[in-house]
UniProtKB/Swiss-Prot annotation:
GO terms for cellular component: extracellular space. This is Brain-specific serine protease 4. It comes from Mus musculus. It comes from the Eukaryota. PANTHER family: ACROSIN-RELATED (PTHR24252), HYALIN (PTHR24252:SF7). Coiled coil: none annotated. PROSITE patterns: TRYPSIN_DOM, TRYPSIN_HIS, TRYPSIN_SER. Disulfide bonds join 75-91, 175-248, 208-227, 238-266. The active site is at residues 90, 141, 242. One of its GO terms (biological process) is proteolysis. The lineage of its organism: Eukaryota, Metazoa, Chordata, Craniata, Vertebrata. Residues 1-32 form the signal peptide.
Length: 307
């Protein structure tokens, strides 16, 4: 991946349950199977580019969606429920009131051949964060996308968790990004456009602020953002990755901790990726999206739990 970024200044009776368990644990292909109950968040049913990234495995990240504009991949997003996706607000810019231009492709691994088990759904409307301004482009860079109809969950289409208030991300925590963005500046992901993944460590917020320092009163890194990546560059998100997830694993659940937002160039030295923090914007999402699932680390027991 190198991830898509805007310019920095702009931017369930028992029989039924038994059948479900068989479907979820079978090693045989289940191409026509769907999960008809609300599944646990952040838990892929199957295990295993971005700049310096590598191919992901089919259904490894079943919450990642492609947001299409006029039928072509434009940005990525993350599935929260059967009707809601979250992404970066800058993916829509001045087209917030033109949802018919966009659609969402779910369950795809290779965009060049998404296959019959993928689902394509229109967008009913887009709701950006109230503090987002497309002219400025970086502050509160988060938007909720309402799908035209409910989707069917399957082993390839599952929701991700949001972090609860117990979650902390100390520097050097290893997390992951994934997307279908360019593999270098000006070099699109080649056919068949296989979803790329990349491990990225969390970067200390004060260090990131210093790297992007623009002078007093002009702080580029704010409390609603977090940084991750490599100071030496070479590996990063790039164009077409915007809106995709920064995912951290807590026990056996994957949490959406950030949204790919911006940076300067792709994989440039001392210019790590900047992400919209879901820790900072979780409450806003919860007020709007019914049924979103939270998980986190409970300090007294070390278990996951919802809140």
């Amino acid at each position: 991946m190198m991830i898509s970024r805007p310019p920095p200044a702009l931017g369930g009776d028992q029989f039924s349950i038994l059948i479900l368990l068989v479907l979820l644990t079978s090693t045989a292909p289940i191409s026509a199977a769907t999960i008809r109950v609300s599944p646990d968040c952040g838990k892929p049913q199957q295990l295993n580019r971005i700049v310096g990234g590598e191919d992901s495995m089919d259904a490894q990240w079943p919450w990642i969606v492609s947001i299409l504009k006029n039928g072509s991949h434009h940005c990525a997003g993350s599935l929260l429920t059967n009707r809601w996706v979250v992404t970066a607000a800058h993916c829509f810019k001045s087209n917030m009131d033109k949802p018919s231009l966009f659609s969402v492709l779910l369950g795809a691994w290779k965009l060049g051949s998404p296959g019959p088990r993928s689902q394509k759904v229109g967008i009913a409307w887009v709701l950006p964060h109230p503090r987002y301004s497309w002219k400025e482009g970086t502050h509160a860079d988060i938007a909720l996308v309402r799908l035209e109809h409910s989707i069917q969950f399957s082993e390839r289409i599952l929701p991700i968790c949001l972090p609860d208030s117990s979650v902390r991300l100390p520097p050097k925590t290893d997390c992951w990004i994934a997307g279908w963005g360019s593999i270098q500046d000006g070099v699109p992901l080649p056919h068949p456009q296989t979803l790329q993944k990349l491990k990225v460590p969390i970067i200390d917020s004060e260090l990131c602020k210093s790297l992007y320092w623009r002078g007093a009163g002009q702080e580029a890194i704010t409390e609603g953002m977090l940084c991750a990546g490599y100071l030496e560059g070479e590996r990063d998100a790039c164009l077409g990755d915007s809106g995709g997830p920064l995912m951290c694993q807590v026990d056996d659940h994957w949490l959406l901790t950030g949204i790919i937002s911006w940076g300067e160039g792709c994989a440039e030295r001392n210019r790590p990726g900047v992400y919209t923090s879901l820790l900072a914007h979780r409450s806003w999402v919860q007020r709007i999206v019914q049924g979103v699932q939270l998980r986190g680390y409970l300090a007294d027991s070390g278990d996951t739990g919802s809140s």
